[in-house]
A protein has these predicted regions:
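Beta-loop-alpha module in the N-terminal Rossmann-like domain of NAD(P)-dependent dehydrogenases
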Residues: 52-116
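C-terminal glycine/acidic-rich active-site capping loop/insertion
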Residues: 239-247
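Nucleotide donor/acceptor-binding cores
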Residues: 7-9, 95, 122, 152
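A contiguous active-site-proximal alpha/beta segment in oxidoreductase catalytic domains
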Residues: 65, 72, 103-172
């Protein structure tokens, strides 16, 4: 990527040796205006740092902030621990902070983070659910126009096989975007946590898990979420049925 701006930015990736954080680390390391910093405690941290020629490596944000306050920090961590890290960045004086979806387990905590960032003048961003699927916004506009008739039912065909909050918020966000409706009631069941998707620091009440059931939407339509089946992973994120057909 080429830019007329010659300024360089110090960008720290917290969890940059993780399953998803590695993509952020690669992006920062390969950008001509970024000096990447890796904050991670995993066994493969040093291997990732060597691969990307990252020389500034720390185990914790506390260690990093004792040396410097970067321009940007990306907190790519499980939702159970991410909010505290985001707020630590804000308090340290970082001016640009991002985290992975969702922002927090509880809406009130997410609101607090957004408001704190706004009050402190911090640019804050979270995830990519609205634009990772091509033509999502355009499809939502077509549905809203009435060209396909009225929406009669909605489903998340693949269910929520590993997480409701972490991996599941993408489907839920895209369902809300396509239908233009909000969830008014929930009826369902949770399943045991999937080991690799649970943060070691998480309490039982914080641990994310698979689930299935029904969601009552503000437009009167019900969204069906079937029980996930290991032997049949369905790639379709959201299915919308209208009086004229199905998308």
């Amino acid at each position: 990527m080429t830019s007329n701006d010659s300024h360089r930015y110090r960008v720290a990736i917290v969890g940059g040796a993780g399953m998803w954080g590695r993509h952020y680390l690669t992006a920062a390391a390969e950008h001509e205006q970024c000096d990447a910093i890796l904050v991670d405690t995993s066994d493969r941290r040093d291997e990732f740092a060597a691969h990307h020629n990252v020389t500034d490596v720390y185990s914790t944000l506390e260690e990093l902030f004792a040396v410097e306050v970067p321009d940007v920090v990306c907190c790519i961590l499980p939702v159970q621990v991410a909010p505290a890290m985001v707020l630590a960045c804000v308090e340290a004086g970082v001016k640009v902070v991002s985290c992975e979806k969702p922002i927090a387990i509880e809406l009130a905590e997410a609101d607090r983070i957004v408001n704190t960032c706004r009050d402190k003048g911090v640019a804050f961003g979270c995830a990519t659910a609205h634009w990772e699927v091509p033509l999502l916004d355009e499809t939502a506009a077509w549905l809203a126009s009435g060209e396909f008739g009225d929406i009669t039912s909605v489903a998340i065909p693949g269910g929520l096989p590993v997480e409701v909050s972490g991996a599941g918020c993408v489907q839920l966000t895209q369902m809300r975007g396509l239908t233009g409706a909000e969830v008014e009631w929930v009826e369902g069941y949770e399943l045991p946590s999937v080991g690799a998707y649970r943060a070691e620091e998480a309490s039982d009440i914080e641990a994310d898990c698979p689930a299935y059931g029904r969601l009552g939407l503000s437009n009167g339509v019900i969204c069906e979420i079937p029980q996930p089946r290991d032997e049949m992973r369905i790639p379709c994120r959201v299915s919308v049925t209208t009086t004229q057909g199905r998308l």
